[in-house]
């Protein structure tokens, strides 16, 4: 019974820590929306799934392509200890890239910055030409795919694993995600 009590106290402590967390601040105004791409290349906001998405800012639409750029990015978990100092890099639309390096080289940090889990001290990170600080965090994170070092698959089919982030995904949406 004593072990049970210790486990319960440990669980309660984690719950209280979670409850004390400050809500994440999100001042982004640019959102992700499904679009129809017309024959002339223009975009029209769509009601349902179309397979194409765009960044919506006020009345303008910018097609989601996946162009990610770091320009002179400076970041450190503390002001005194910079992890990245003036880094510039880019990933072209559709390009698959891998960050390879020793432990502590900044691979996971770069992924965390793209997702805005942390804010950079200076420089810019753009996504399809839009400063990511202007994009709503939920929409930014929905638009990204990543495989981190410790990859875990769940029981079930490959489709079930892909559906993990969107349980109501249709087979068509899964096929689109795989292409």
Question: Which functions belong to the PLM regions below?
Answer:
Residues 21-24, 174:
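Hydrophobic patch in the ABC ATPase nucleotide-binding domain
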Residues 11, 21, 137, 141:
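ATP/adenylate-binding site constellation spanning eukaryotic-like Ser/Thr protein kinases
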């Amino acid at each position: 019974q004593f072990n049970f009590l210790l486990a319960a106290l440990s669980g309660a402590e984690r719950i209280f820590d979670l409850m004390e967390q400050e809500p994440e601040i999100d001042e982004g105004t640019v959102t992700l929306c499904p679009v129809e791409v017309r024959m002339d290349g223009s975009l029209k906001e769509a009601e349902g799934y179309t397979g194409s998405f765009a960044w919506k800012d006020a009345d303008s639409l910018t097609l989601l392509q996946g162009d990610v750029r770091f320009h002179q990015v400076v970041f450190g978990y503390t002001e005194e200890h910079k992890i990245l100092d003036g880094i510039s890099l880019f990933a072209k639309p559709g390009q698959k890239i891998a960050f390879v390096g020793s432990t502590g080289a900044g691979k996971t940090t770069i992924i965390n910055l793209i997702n805005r889990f942390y804010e950079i001290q200076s420089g810019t990170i753009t996504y399809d030409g839009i400063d990511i600080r202007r994009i709503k965090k939920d929409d930014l994170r929905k638009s990204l795919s990543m495989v981190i070092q410790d990859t875990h698959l769940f029981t079930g089919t490959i489709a079930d694993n892909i559906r993990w982030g969107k349980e109501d995904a249709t087979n068509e949406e899964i096929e689109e995600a795989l292409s």
